[in-house]
């Protein structure tokens, strides 16, 4: 976890809060349930509360949910991580990252 904090900083990617070390968790950008692995390229720092709330939802869905509630997730860091994953040696990382990156950069659909 310390290497992750040194690489990305101590702030949660979802809420921006700097949690106590015991509340820091490794956030799988591509969740394990969607083929993600516990590799440095697929990991960002998140507080325990945000990691639990997100569960295994896709990045774009959780970003939109947070923004609708007034949150400010670090979309730049998420895009950068997803872009890096599109070049992964792991096919499932590449495919899911490309799909999530497209959805994250697409304009939000107006409510119907």
Which functions belong to the PLM regions below?
Residues 35-53:
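Short beta-strand-alpha-helix junction that forms the catalytic/metal-binding core
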Residues 25-29:
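Histidine-centered catalytic micro-motifs used for acid/base chemistry in nuclease
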Residues 1-3, 31-37:
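Short, intrinsically disordered, charge-biased short linear motifs at domain edges
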Residues 107-112:
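C-terminal, charged low-complexity interaction regions
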Residues 64-70:
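Catalytic-site neighborhood detector that most strongly recognizes the C-terminal catalytic loop/helix
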Residues 21-22, 53-56:
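Short, non-ligating residues that shape and space the ligands of small metal-coordination modules
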Residues 1-24, 47:
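Short cysteine-rich loop/turn motifs with clustered Cys
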Residues 1-11, 77-91, 100-101:
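Short, charged surface segments at domain edges that flank catalytic/cofactor-binding sites
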